[in-house]
Each structure stands twice: as structure tokens, then as C-alpha cells.
């Protein structure tokens, strides 16, 4: 496919992925200030906290306080994640303040799945009916199934597209057997193995099997190919991406400490702007949010546009200079 989408949907995941990855304490006020700044950028979906055990993820101990403290912008979906039934119950109590997305995560690698959940991929899929039932009780008769390590794994090597399709087929069969359905597919390059050709191969293979199911990509910039992979995905017609302001985040189970986190929101918005793809996001406001994110965490973050700036600013200066001359 040579044509790229006219518009794309971007979910901002920086606060959730970024805060949980930080070792130093971050104040509730600083967390809220970043979410509020993101709310003013035009992004339509912000994943900003997790309902998880504070014992294991202390940065997420203030999930309820964050939800109570943020200033909601019209038209913005505020989202969270959960890893177990207790987390979902906490989220469900606040569904007037949250957009609940019925999600179920698996992986293309048994080793990575075990490090994440202490279960094999097949054991994890056996848990899907229980999740489907919980979501159905909340009036959500579908699941979005995300495949972590969909392109490669630091423990097992390359992950072939047929492996990902097999995992998704098993998940779909379990969902349909209990009256649910596959609502969306997420493909995550959790450890930064993907290259543009792999993106096209996997997206093409998945779309051949599920031509009418939305596909979302969650890409990490571990080996500096995330933006190139976004271009490849756009060329395949993918129109939904997870991104993180200033490149916040990472994966604690990926076996490479200090590696770059998620693909940077402002870099992707800039890419789309230059390619004529509409995101609905104010790039200058997102650059400001990226600079704020860096101040909040107290150390440099990998996003490029924080220092490089928006080309439209330079174009405007150049036009003004020509007029003056």
C-alpha cells in the first residue's frame, strides 16, 4: 500500500509507562501537572496510571488520587491499565471518571510471558474466558488483544508472523467460545527488534487473517528504528499508535537496562505533520509537554523535538525574512 492514512489516532502512554519506570519519587502534583499539560495538546486518549500493587510498582500507589486531581478536557479519553481482577475492580469503581478498555495481553515469546506473568503463553490464554466474563458484566462484550514481543525477544530471538497469528487465533477462539469477540489487535515491539520490512510482513499477515479488525502498534525505540517503523506502518494503512511524550518509559522485563523507551509522541506528530497526515495534536504544545516531562522526572529524555523544534516555526521565520527583504 503506497497511500498513507489521512488521519491517525495517537494514544499518549507516557505518564503511565514513564512514571512506573522511574526509580526516584515523583510528587502527585508533578504527575497531575504533566497529564494536564497533555490534555491541552489535542491528543484524544491519555493512558496515565495503573491499578497495580504499590508493593511492586510504588509510583502507581496514587492512582485514585491522580484520577481525582486531573483537569479533564472535553473529548479526551482518560485511561488506565490493570493486571488482575483486583485492579479491574478498582478501575470499575471509577468508570465515571475513566474510559475502560477491555484489554488482554499475551506475548509472542513464552520466556518473556513468564517473566511478565509467571505463566506460559498458553497458560495465559486459558485465563481469557475469566477476563471476558468480567468485561461482559461491565457491559463490554469484546476484548482488545495485545501481543507483546510480537517482532522479537531478547530471550528467544526473532518472532515469526505465523507465531503471532497462532497466538491471536487461540485468543480469538477462547473469546468466541464464551460469547465475546476480538475487538482490536495490538502489536508491540516491546524490546525494539522490529525493522520496517518486519512491520510490513507482520501487519500484512495479520490483516490477511483479520481484514476488518483494527490494528494498533506499540513501538519502542530501543535501536533507533521506531520512527522508520511508523513510516512503514503508515504505508500499510495502520492508523493507530501508542506513543510517549519525550520518549518516557521502557520495559522492566526486557533485559537491557537503560534502553530507550516508547516512540516519542512529539517526534511522531512531527513526522505526520511533514507527511501531511492529520493527528489533531498541536505540535508546539506537545513539545512544551515533553520539556515539562523532562523537568518532572529530573533527567534527560530521548525525544528529539524538545531541542530540535517544529520546522513550521523556522518556515514562518524564513517567510517573514523574505517579506522583509
Short names for language-model regions:
Residues 1-325:
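Catalytic cores and adjacent flexible loops of soluble metabolic enzymes
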Amino acid at each position: 500500500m503506497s497511500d498513507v492514512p489521512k488521519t491517525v489516532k495517537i494514544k499518549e502512554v507516557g505518564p503511565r509507562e514513564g512514571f512506573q519506570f522511574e526509580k526516584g519519587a515523583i510528587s502527585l502534583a508533578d504527575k497531575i501537572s504533566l497529564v494536564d499539560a497533555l490534555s491541552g495538546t489535542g491528543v484524544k486518549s491519555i493512558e496515565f496510571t495503573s491499578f497495580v500493587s504499590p508493593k511492586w510498582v510504588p509510583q502507581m500507589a496514587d492512582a485514585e488520587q491522580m484520577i481525582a486531581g486531573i483537569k479533564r478536557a472535553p473529548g479526551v479519553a482518560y485511561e488506565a491499565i490493570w493486571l488482575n481482577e483486583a485492579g479491574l475492580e478498582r478501575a470499575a469503581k471509577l468508570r465515571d471518571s475513566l474510559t475502560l478498555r477491555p484489554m488482554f495481553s499475551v506475548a509472542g515469546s513464552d520466556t518473556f510471558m513468564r517473566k511478565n506473568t509467571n505463566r506460559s503463553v498458553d497458560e495465559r490464554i486459558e485465563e481469557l474466558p475469566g477476563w471476558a466474563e468480567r468485561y461482559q458484566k461491565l457491559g463490554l462484550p469484546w476484548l482488545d488483544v495485545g501481543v507483546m514481543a510480537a517482532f522479537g525477544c531478547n530471550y528467544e530471538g526473532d518472532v515469526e508472523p505465523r507465531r503471532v497469528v497462532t497466538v491471536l487465533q487461540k485468543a480469538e477462539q477462547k473469546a468466541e467460545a464464551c460469547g465475546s469477540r476480538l475487538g482490536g489487535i495490538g502489536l508491540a515491539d516491546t524490546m525494539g527488534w522490529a525493522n520496517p520490512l518486519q512491520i510490513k510482513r507482520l501487519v500484512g499477515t495479520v490483516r490477511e487473517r483479520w481484514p476488518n479488525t483494527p490494528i494498533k502498534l506499540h513501538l519502542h525505540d530501543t535501536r533507533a528504528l521506531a520512527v522508520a517503523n511508523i513510516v512503514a506502518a503508515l504505508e500499510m494503512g495502520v492508523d493507530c499508535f501508542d506513543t510517549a511524550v519525550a520518549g518516557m518509559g521502557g520495559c522492566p522485563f526486557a533485559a537491557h537496562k537503560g534502553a530507550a523507551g516508547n516512540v516519542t509522541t512529539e517526534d511522531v506528530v512531527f513526522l505526520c505533520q511533514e507527511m501531511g497526515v492529520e493527528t489533531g495534536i498541536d505540535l508546539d504544545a506537545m513539545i512544551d509537554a515533553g520539556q515539562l516531562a523532562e523537568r518532572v522526572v529530573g533527567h534527560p529524555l530521548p525525544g528529539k523535538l524538545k531541542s530540535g523544534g517544529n520546522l513550521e516555526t523556522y518556515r514562518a521565520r524564513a517567510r517573514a525574512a523574505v517579506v522583509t527583504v
